[in-house]
């Protein structure tokens, strides 16, 4: 009986050990949230879009993540721009955003994550502005881990590539 009680307590603690104040810095590279559950392998019910397919170095592009249906909400995210394995550029979170915050994954503001919010404040759509480094050229993809709830999450979902052009 005591064993069952201990298992129940440990399970409850695991369920509350998700990261309500944002992704841990340890998730910056692999983008795995550490929920003690396996990520979903089927395609995510979310899209990652940009209004343009190319931008000059030093310029910005809006990146939008949307659930495909109203039920496809987000409890948490970790969003980065990647060129190969490198996290590049900086993000701007809209003023007054009650869902998101910039994150330091080696450089200030080079990722976006969620912050503490009530379940009723889960989002179906979020948008952020990404600014390319002025000296960057080549393709970049926007990579996101999306958490719908503790046991339903998709890791390292990618956008179509955006070409970064020489700013000269």
Curated annotation (Swiss-Prot):
Organs and tissues of expression: Very highly expressed in midgut, and highly expressed in fat body, silk gland and epidermis.
Q: Which GO terms describe its cellular component?
A: extracellular region; membrane
Task: Indicate yes or no for the key word Amino-acid biosynthesis.
Answer: no
Disulfide-bond pairs as recorded = 28-105
All copies of the Reelin domain together span 19-168
Region forming the signal peptide: 1-18
| Compartments in which it is found | Secreted
Q: Does the keyword Signal apply?
A: yes
Q: Name one GO biological process term.
A: defense response to protozoan
- List, alphabetically, the InterPro entries matched: Ferric-chelate_Red/DefProt (IPR051237), Reeler_dom (IPR002861), Reeler_sf (IPR042307)
What induces this one? By bacteria (E.coli and M.luteus).
Role description: As this protein is expressed upon bacterial infection, it may have antimicrobial activity.
| Family statement drawn from the similarity comment of this UniProt entry | Belongs to the insect defense protein family.
Q: What is this protein called?
A: Putative defense protein 1
- Please name the source species: Antheraea mylitta
């Amino acid at each position: 009986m005591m064993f069952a009680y201990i298992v129940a307590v440990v399970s409850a603690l695991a369920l509350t050990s998700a990261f309500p104040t944002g992704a841990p810095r340890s998730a910056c590279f692999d983008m795995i949230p550490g929920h003690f559950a396996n990520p979903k392998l089927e395609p995510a019910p979310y899209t990652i879009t940009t209004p343009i397919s190319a931008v000059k170095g030093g310029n910005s592009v809006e990146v939008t993540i949307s659930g495909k249906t109203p039920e496809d909400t987000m409890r948490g995210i970790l969003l980065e721009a990647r060129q190969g394995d490198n996290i590049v550029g900086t993000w701007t979170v809209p003023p007054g955003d009650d869902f998101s915050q910039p994150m330091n994954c080696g450089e200030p503001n080079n990722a976006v994550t969620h912050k503490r919010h009530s379940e009723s404040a889960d989002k179906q759509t979020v948008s952020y502005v990404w600014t390319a480094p002025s000296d960057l050229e080549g393709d970049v993809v926007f990579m996101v881990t999306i958490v719908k709830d503790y046991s339903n999450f998709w890791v390292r979902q990618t956008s179509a590539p955006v070409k970064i052009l020489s700013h000269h």
